[in-house]
Amino acid sequence: MPSNHLPTLYQEFIHLSRYSRWLPEKGRRETWGETIERYFGFFSEHLKEMHGYEIKKSLKDKLENAILECKIMPSMRCLMTAGEALKRENISGYNCSYVAVDRVQAFDEILYVLMNGTGVGFSVERQFVSKLPVVAEEFFPSDTVITVADSKLGWAKALKELVGMLYIGQVPKWDLGKIRPAGTPLKTFGGRASGPEPLNGLFNFCVNIFKKANGRKLSSIECHDIVCKIAEIVVVGGVRRSALISLSNLSDDRMRHAKSGQWWEHEGQRALANNSACYTEKPDMGVFMDEWKALYDSKSGERGIFNRASATEQAARNGRRNTEGHEYGTNPCSEIILRDREFCNLSEVVVRPEDTKETLLEKVELAAILGTFQSTLVNFKYVSKEWSKNCAEERLLGVSITGIMDNPLTNGKKGNLDSLLKELKERAIKSNATIAKEIGIPQSAAITCVKPSGTVSQLVDAASGIHARHNPYYIRTVRGDKKDPLTQMMVEAGFPVEDDIMNPGHTSVFSFPMKAPSHAVFRTDMSAIEQLELWLSYQKHWCEHKPSVTISVKEEEWMEVGSWVFDNFEWMSGVSFLPFSDHTYQQAPYQDCDVEAYKKMLSSMPKNVDWSVLASYETRDMTVGSQELACTAGGCEI
């Protein structure tokens, strides 16, 4: 029987700090094995109740063991919320969503989806925002008082009421007295309440924007800013867990320059979204060069490229998706092709250095089964019926591969990569079709992708998605709140620790020595063009959606990379470009070290750590809830 514990101290820390739920009856946090038991306990009951389907014991054992041994991973949203939270609201099991801002309801629906921990892609393209109504010419104070109930539904309904009144020129008062104080534990969903102040800030922000838009429709940048402000208020225990991508027209100058100059001084909410231009056809060279130069000048990879024509062609390629009448969008990491008002769940294959074609095929089969189980979550509260309709029709999966650079078969150094990827994709499709038929649901319309895999790769100790390892040896730093019992326990257990230089009074920084597998590829081993060629192989031969990647571009490579992107534009989407940096700073998440420094730190790590003693430090729920930033390249620390 596999161990109930994870193999390394770092992996144990990631589980306890990110995914472990508080067990009030036992007065402690879950073990790794108990987290997995909770996940399967939920799905066994859910599938039986909703579909009359019982998971065979032999299959359940195989799936449980594969997760215990970190061979595959389910949706980390499901892993976090399985139980009462997921039963109460199925949205909380999803990683990704997309919505066009073409209806007034889009704003409160986005708030509700984000509050469930799901990442949101949204579009403020003019063909959508032009459908919004005209704002009133004049504004008058109203006697109406919006009383906000202390729940996700309460917050969403209150925002809906406020926006509705602002459109007709009435400025109501609001009563936030029922909202729990900041820091109050959230029993069902986990984590801690953010208090009334963020919602008050959002309401005032909306009033100001609407007053400036009197007598006309909201502009794209105004809609963008409202959505960003909505995301900014969705915080739990100081952990931002909102992820956004904003799509705008290529010709939209205001959105192109949304992050130009000292934008953070006056428009801090814009930090919450990654921005991409939406291409509906291949641009001419002049337009492309202008946008490429703006991306280069930004030093932050913005605006990124979302190619809707490419996404539509990709969606149609497998013959299982009805693309007619759909203007596709994407999720914050840009690996899933989504209809307006649609969710996607993710699951993951973890590639190990010793994996063979046979073991990879088995992992793909099991990861597709998990995704198929998760695709039965179609009971959504509050949001419009289109969300449930789209999910029930398409049953999208996002079966991803992480650790690609750790194995010569998957990183292209050995064997025929294209042939292997085709075989793996066919196995995923077949696995889904078989299990979907047994459950009694439609086959999924699209199945395979590559996600950035930030927190998951940390949990399982693998290279992130299709990204290279940092270095053969490196030090990984992670932060802990000094009030958190886990931090206090680790300090006393003797983990290497120092005060956070930016916040010494409240935050500790722990260091973990890390060693990459011997056949791994490192970030200095590949040129930007080589990274793109590997990405293209996965796009053509593995993905029914898209592979998400962040390409590190050296200063002398920008012209060549721009040329490659233009030449391969029909495939482009899901790629971010950032300047390659050797620059490191104090307490950076990844720090290069040599073998001697690695061995020295390894010898200083505490031995035989008994994580169960954490229970003696914590007498009530101090978990901070869903720290996984639903899905965002910025949150993945790649």
Identify the function of each model-found stretch.
Residues 1-638:
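Extended catalytic cores of very large enzyme megasubunits
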